[in-house]
Amino acid sequence: MVTHSKFPAAGMSRPLDTSLRLKTFSSKSEYQLVVNAVCKLQESGFYWSAVTGGEANLLLSAEPAGTFLIRDSSDQRHFFTLSVKTQSGTKNLRIQCEGGSFSLQSDPRSTQPVPRFDCVLKLVHHYMPPPGAPSFPAPPTEPSSEVSEQPPSQPLPGNPPRRAYYIYSGGEKIPLVLSRPLSSNVATLQHLCRKTVNGHLDSYEKVTQLPGAIREFLDQYDAPL
């Protein structure tokens, strides 16, 4: 069974059909925020559109821990879900859209501020470790739910400190590790080059020095993943 979505499947360019989305938009600005997110997700290659949680579990079952994908949420209160393979199996994390930003649904008892972003790709990139960074070991289990943040651990020499994030599910406390997206299609050479360029543009001045056509192409997808 496939959950209907008002958004087309990844890679398709037909107009959005607003009659099929179960969750309604709270404002015109939220509608535009979600439409922009979908456009970039379709370019990403790891947006699996209307697959269900069960189908996501099958897709990720043979993949190593840290593999993830983005799909339409089956929950009528949300637009997107992050499905990630962990050492304890596939976990599904709802992506909240409120106040003009996206965030992972967090543990309501946590006192830490929830990281928020104007783009789903930026949200995903935030939770990915930098190149060469080690994975965090699993801490002792404790009952809770959703996602929580903990202070940075002692970094290795030459590496900046990084906060650890954990998934709370069924009494387990599982490190949230996003290592590799699961591709839904074969990326073009242009897109691969664009991701590489995005990963090396660390200042606005560098972007403004590029030709206008290249800047426009980069603006359509401004993430390195």
UniProtKB/Swiss-Prot annotation:
A Pfam family reported for this protein in Swiss-Prot or TrEMBL: SH2
Keywords per UniProt: Growth regulation, Phosphoprotein, SH2 domain, Signal transduction inhibitor, Ubl conjugation pathway
Keyword Phosphoprotein on entry: yes
CDD domains (alphabetical): SH2_SOCS3 (cd10384)
Record-annotated SOCS box domain positions: 177-224
Gene3D superfamilies: SH2 domain, SOCS box
Chain ranges of the SH2 domain: 46-142
The keyword Phosphoprotein belongs to this UniProt entry's keyword annotation: yes
Family matches, as PANTHER family: PHOSPHATIDYLINOSITOL 3-KINASE REGULATORY SUBUNIT, SUPPRESSOR OF CYTOKINE SIGNALING 3
Swiss-Prot/TrEMBL domain comment: The ESS and SH2 domains are required for JAK phosphotyrosine binding. Further interaction with the KIR domain is necessary for signal and kinase inhibition.
Subunit (UniProt): Interacts with multiple activated proteins of the tyrosine kinase signaling pathway including IGF1 receptor, insulin receptor and JAK2. Binding to JAK2 is mediated through the KIR and SH2 domains to a phosphorylated tyrosine residue within the JAK2 JH1 domain. Binds specific activated tyrosine residues of the leptin, EPO, IL12, GSCF and gp130 receptors. Interaction with CSNK1E stabilizes SOCS3 protein. Component of the probable ECS(SOCS3) E3 ubiquitin-protein ligase complex which contains CUL5, RNF7/RBX2, Elongin BC complex and SOCS3. Interacts with CUL5, RNF7, ELOB and ELOC.
Name the record gives this protein: Suppressor of cytokine signaling 3
Originating species: Canis lupus familiaris (Dog)
Top-level taxonomy: Eukaryota, Metazoa, Chordata, Craniata, Vertebrata
Gene transcribed to yield this protein: SOCS3
